[in-house]
Amino acid sequence: MVLKTSQKAGSFLLALVMLLSLTSVFCFKSASAATDGEWKYELENGGVTITGFIGTSRTISVPSKVNGQRVKKVTALNNNNTKASVTTVSFANGIEEIGTGVCKGYISLERVALPDTLVTIGSDAFFNCSSLTGITIPNSVTTIGTNAFNGCIALISADLSCKATVIPDGLFTGCKSLTTAALPSYTTDIGVAAFSGCSSLASINIPDTVKTIAKDAFNGCASLKRISLSTELKTIGEMAFKDCTGLTEIFIPNKVKTISEEAFSGCTSLQNAYIGSSVSVIKKYIFSGCTALKNIVFGGDYYNFTDLSSTAVTGTYTYYPSKYADGWSHYDVVNMKSYSAPTSVAISGTTEAAPGAKVTLKVTATPAGGEFNNVYVLKSSNPNVAYISDDGTIIARATGITTITAYTVSGASASVTFSVTPDKPQNLTATAKTTTSAELTWKEIPNVTGYNIYRSTSKNGTFKKVGSATTNSYTDKGLSKGKTYYYKVACYVNSDGKQALSAYSSVVSVKAAAPAPAQISAKKA
């Protein structure tokens, strides 16, 4: 029995040793932290995650590979005092994620180069990089974390032409040197204090996809004189534009439902506020401290005037559509007047332009004679093709097609298609190939989708499209022998399912006939 017990004990100890051995091996494999030159890294998810930089260079170039493995993620760089001296950080193509706080507190960092493969920028990634002057977010980025550039006090410009739909909380809070910011065309939400304290921000284009502007989003943007709000906007948060002391006018679009507390309080230069017909909830103190406010013009028939009354300013007049006069008579808000609200609007003028051209469209509201018929906003569906300047001028930027829409405070609107057209084809020639075909050639136009070819049987007759080409030549077949044909060509760019068509080339003619035979010489035998 004693022998058997000893055998059992020995077997148990042997099994325990083997288990501990396997466990230690397993633990070693899971703890894959390693170093390769200046880089600390871990292997995970089929790639490398860089967890630290142990070099001393002031210029850091994060590689695409470490120890032969592709770098996918960076979670940390300098974790010591040398980070204060780093001036440049570049991330190689292939990197998909920059983690939380990677460059936080790099106070000497002046330049950052982000890769075209980047998808995610973590929270606080460049927090308090107080020497950074500019940033371009690649198109590939879909997610930006909160406070990513918070406290970058030297930042002048930010290009966020990426796929992110949310501008996160605190993204540029305290970036007091920021003058311009291009938001993603996919943006739906602008987060809490996203641009709070950006006191040099002079202009910003809010895409028409934005539905929510959160609390304090633009609080303290003292240089903003005018802002064009999204036509899809539904909610303006508390103190969203508080202390925007340069703002002189605001137009609330016709899908906004709620304007929250103190939304425009402290806007000491604000003179006119136009509030769209869709607004049904107006919270307290939205115009508190707006000492220059002259007119509040409503476009609709219902507002919470009890809350609005607490924002009354001496000398301010409130206007409402005359058809709702009886409904407002019992409210004691501020000086009230009625006006003839536009019921329709029309746009006229040139709707084609070359890149770089400036165009002014005429907007006419009816019935004529309304006090605010000249108050409207213009919007471009594709600002990359043409955008609207602060004075309402349309600036043609690149070939394509956009829709220009005019909106009035009462909700009336009208749209026109606006084309930015390429240069017309030059040096068109036509040569008879056979008795039934002709070859056309012309000078190639760069950056166009293709060319349309038009034919007529008389120079001043009706031209009909006979074909298209993607190169600068075309052979027209099926002609009648001995007949003269006239041709012209236009080039085009595809845009939003339509063609932005250039002006026509000059007209050329050709007679369908076999080309003359080559001269033949022969010697007498």
What are the residue ranges of the model-derived segments?
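Short beta-strand segments within Ig-like beta-sandwich modules, predominantly Fibronectin type-III
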Residues: 385-388, 465-470
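Pro/Thr/Ser/Gly-rich low-complexity, intrinsically disordered linker/stalk tracts
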Residues: 422-447, 481, 497-525
